[in-house]
Amino acid sequence: MSIPVAQACSFLFVPATHPERFQKALASGADMVIVDWEDAVAPADKAGARVALLEAALTLDAAQRARLLVRLNAEGTPWFADDLAALAQLMARGLAGAVVPKAEHLPTLQAVAHAAGARAALLPLIESVAGLDAVDALA
């Protein structure tokens, strides 16, 4: 059963480099599963992690895809632009939305929102003093 992201109480992270774990994570009882492209993925594996999630999304049913979020790499990293392109494809396949790490600037959230589309949930992570200072603008 899928619930709106805004009502989710539990989130489980799973590395995108291990698509064999996606089903287990979805069956864990967590309300939402966050497939991680950021910290759980080595730099050399970033492109493969995007492909793994894109391919895995094709094997999941609509209710399962609606419980998936993807944690992007932060803006300013070499992977951010490619993450946004892949995010657009994933949203077309019915994923719930994106987790935006190190959120500090409104234009970053706007870029993610543009790539993800109007129905996407965006969960900005405030991880720095700069993000905390900008929290009103980010809301």
Give the ranges of each region predicted by the language model.
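Conserved alpha/beta-domain cores
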Residues: 2-139
